[in-house]
């Protein structure tokens, strides 16, 4: 275990609340807390993994700062594998900041840097780098499924797979090195067969893993989803129905939504960042025109388009132009207002949809919403999100490293097939082995670690 100084930080979100937590970690964590703690027993004398009621006081005046419950956890069975103390004080802004100030006034303790607790857990071997990154994914998860994927990664699901692949590559590399060191055995042809078989299997698994990248990124980052359509077809009603709150103004007046409105929503485990756009149409209103331009920008950057049509009207030229604007994009066509007399040509709608899902709804009565949710989930997850038990790769850094390693193995296989010198094959496999090691942090550089952990919040 590496030697560090003692750090402290607030580990709970700022703001009003019943309880806040100040966390300490390091060789003098218990000693530091004990200096300002007054209770039935000294913290330096209590057993590990116990919690104690007491008060925090100013050392010079013995004035009470706050009542606290103190958790004492001694190394190595802690998150950082160091001595850890958590001070559970009253929530709010003033109380918890005063407790932190009291701790930082003590000698040999400093304010933690962003992500430093997790960084210490990594450097002390408690978790690897992919598990550390999954901690932030868990904090930022917007759906149950995204949380499940993050927890699986924290528990080492991706880590173990990467370790197994690196071990398989290492065995292949070792076979090559035997051939290089003992050329008199003339086993080069056999070694090439081993490379084709073993390295080929690693490449196959990496290819399967990369196939989950699109779905993994959706679960991790969400789908940017633009709701588009002519004015007053029910776009804001759709947003409010999915969010279950009145976020957008719903009136009979065309052009009411004059800007884009964004909201996150969980649709059957798929996180959507819904963007309710202003109706796209030609207008003389300067403010509405600015909203229309933002709508066009949202349309171009969206992962998914929800095109809303008015079933009570015949298709208009504006509707057809919207179909043209989303040509080739992931889209679901929503024919709204099914509770009214239908004037729309559904056959023509299906032709314009060009194989993309068409769902009929009455958002006023919330009819057809279940069908819409199913269409969204099945568009990106053929077997449904909740039913899939698999290892996802969702982190952009991991995806890039896997792509690089896969290409290096491809180069090695090509070299072996072309009967190039076996040591040339070994170089590519060794590079792939090193590249995969960056996922777990086995071969990561310090500059990368500093960059990754700086993205964490204070106290984590």
From Swiss-Prot:
Residues engaged in binding K(+): 232, 251, 253, 256
Positions annotated to bind (6S)-5-formyl-5,6,7,8-tetrahydrofolate: 23, 86, 126, 460
Xref: PANTHER family: TRNA MODIFICATION GTPASE GTPBP3, TRNA MODIFICATION GTPASE GTPBP3, MITOCHONDRIAL
Binding site for Mg(2+): 236, 257
Free-text comment on the cofactor: Binds 1 potassium ion per subunit.
Subunit and interaction comment: Homodimer. Heterotetramer of two MnmE and two MnmG subunits.
GO biological process: tRNA methylation; tRNA wobble uridine modification
Signal peptide: none
Gene3D superfamilies noted in UniProt: P-loop containing nucleotide triphosphate hydrolases, Probable tRNA modification gtpase trme, domain 1, tRNA modification GTPase MnmE domain 2
Residues covered by the TrmE-type G domain: 222-381
Name of the gene this protein is made from: mnmE
Descriptive protein name: tRNA modification GTPase MnmE
Annotated keywords: Cytoplasm, GTP-binding, Hydrolase, Magnesium, Metal-binding, Nucleotide-binding, Potassium, tRNA processing
